[in-house]
Amino acid sequence: MTEKINLLNLSEPELQGFIASQGQPLYRATQLLQWIHQRGVTDFSLMTDLSKPFRQQLSEASFVRVPELALERVSADGTHKWLFRLADNNKIETVFIPDRKRGTLCVSSQVGCALNCSFCATGKEGFNRNLTLAEIIGQVWLAARLLKSPYKITNVVMMGMGEPLLNYEAVVAAMHLMMHDHAYGLSKYRVTLSTSGVIPAMRRLREESPVSLAVSLHAPNDALRNVLIPLNKKYSLDQLIPLCRDYYSRGSKRCVTFEYVMIEGMNDRLIDAKQLIRLLADVPCKINLIPFNSFQGTAYRCSTESAISVFQKCLMDAGFNTRVRRTRGDDIAGACGQLAGQFHDRTGRHQRWVQKQGHDFNRPIPAIDH
C-alpha cells in the first residue's frame, strides 16, 4: 500500500506533480492551495468546489497535518509565543509581534540550532534536526488560525529557532508559499530571511528567491565575531561583506539589513561603532541595533540606554540608516535570542552547557487554556 502524503509538505511544483499523478488538471493544485492556506481547511470533505470522487481520491492518497499547539503565552505588550508539538514530540517556538498596523510572525527553521552563537539561548539548547516544509509553513498556518481580531500577519521573518540557510530547500519552499497569491499573498518585501552568514547558500538564495535579507553581524571585526558567531571562523567578514555589498543590484533600491546585538562592554563602545562604519563604508544597508535579551546562565549583559544612544548617533552621523529595535515579549522569553523550545539535543551541547553552569535552564512554559 502506498504511504499517504502530507500535502502541507509539498512545494507548489510538487503539489502540481501530485495532482498530475492523480489524473487531475493542474488548476486543482491552485484550488487546494486556496482551501488549505487561505481558508484553513484540512478536511477534504469540506472542499466543496472539488468533485466528490476527487475528494475521496484525495483522502485515500493524502492528508493535511500541521503541528499541534502545546502551550501559549501572551506578553503584557501583546506579543504571543506558541510552543508547537511536532509529530516526533519535539517542540518548537513561534512568536507573533503586533505593532500598530503590522503584525510580524517570527518563524523557526530548525529544532534547536545547528550553530552555537554565544549570545543566543537557542544555541545553548543544542540541535536535533531540520524542520520539514510542513513544519515551517505549518507555523504560519497555525498562527493565522490562532490569532484573534484585530491581529493579522502582515510580515514573516525567518528569525526563530535555527539557521534558515542550513535548511535551504524547506525554508525557500515555505517562503515561496508565504508569497504565493493563492496561499498567504505576502510581498517579497514582507518576508525576511535572517542568516548568520552561510556564504554558499546566500549566493544561491540571491539567484532563487526575492525575499528580503537580514544578516546577523553583531561585531565589527573577525576576532570578536569569532567569539559571538563561531560560523565566522569558516565564513569570515572578508567573504561576507562583499557579498552583502552586491547582494541587490544598485538600481533596485533594496539593501541588506544588518542586525547588531548590543552587549555591554563587548561590542558597544565608540571604537566599535567607528570600526563598524569603516567595515560597512560602501555597503548599501540598514542597521538594526538590538538590545541584548538575557537568558539564564549567560554572563552577557545588555548595553545601557546611554551606550546604545551614543552608538546609534555615531552611525547615523556617518550616514547609516540606524534604528534601535524595541524589545518585545521579553517577559515571556519570546524576545530576540531567547527562544528555546523543548526537544532532544542530539549534539550533547545542552548537557555540556548545563554541566558548565551547574543548572538546567530548559524553562517550563505555563499554559493558556484553549
From Swiss-Prot:
PROSITE patterns: RADICAL_SAM. S-adenosyl-L-methionine binds at residues 162-163, 194, 216-218, 293. Residues 99-331 form the Radical SAM core domain. InterPro entries: Aldolase_TIM, Methyltransferase_A, RlmN_N, RNA_MTrfase_RlmN, rRNA_lsu_MTrfase_RlmN/Cfr, rSAM. Disulfide bonds join 106-336. The active site is at 93 (proton acceptor), 336 (s-methylcysteine intermediate). Binds 1 [4Fe-4S] cluster. The cluster is coordinated with 3 cysteines and an exchangeable S-adenosyl-L-methionine. It catalyses: adenosine(2503) in 23S rRNA + 2 reduced [2Fe-2S]-[ferredoxin] + 2 S-adenosyl-L-methionine = 2-methyladenosine(2503) in 23S rRNA + 5'-deoxyadenosine + L-methionine + 2 oxidized [2Fe-2S]-[ferredoxin] + S-adenosyl-L-homocysteine; adenosine(37) in tRNA + 2 reduced [2Fe-2S]-[ferredoxin] + 2 S-adenosyl-L-methionine = 2-methyladenosine(37) in tRNA + 5'-deoxyadenosine + L-methionine + 2 oxidized [2Fe-2S]-[ferredoxin] + S-adenosyl-L-homocysteine. GO terms for biological process: rRNA base methylation; tRNA methylation. The keyword Lipid metabolism does not apply. GO terms for cellular component: cytoplasm. It is found in: Cytoplasm. Coiled coil: none annotated. It holds the Pfam family RlmN_N. Its EC number is 2.1.1.192. Keywords: 4Fe-4S, Cytoplasm, Disulfide bond, Iron, Iron-sulfur, Metal-binding, Methyltransferase, rRNA processing, S-adenosyl-L-methionine, Transferase, tRNA processing. GO terms for molecular function: 4 iron, 4 sulfur cluster binding; metal ion binding; rRNA (adenine(2503)-C2-)-methyltransferase activity; rRNA binding; tRNA (adenine(37)-C2)-methyltransferase activity; tRNA binding. [4Fe-4S] cluster binds at residues 113, 117, 120. Its cofactor is [4Fe-4S] cluster. Specifically methylates position 2 of adenine 2503 in 23S rRNA and position 2 of adenine 37 in tRNAs. m2A2503 modification seems to play a crucial role in the proofreading step occurring at the peptidyl transferase center and thus would serve to optimize ribosomal fidelity. Reaction proceeds by a ping-pong mechanism involving intermediate methylation of a conserved cysteine residue. Belongs to the radical SAM superfamily. RlmN family. This is Dual-specificity RNA methyltransferase RlmN. It comes from Coxiella burnetii (strain RSA 493 / Nine Mile phase I). The gene is rlmN.
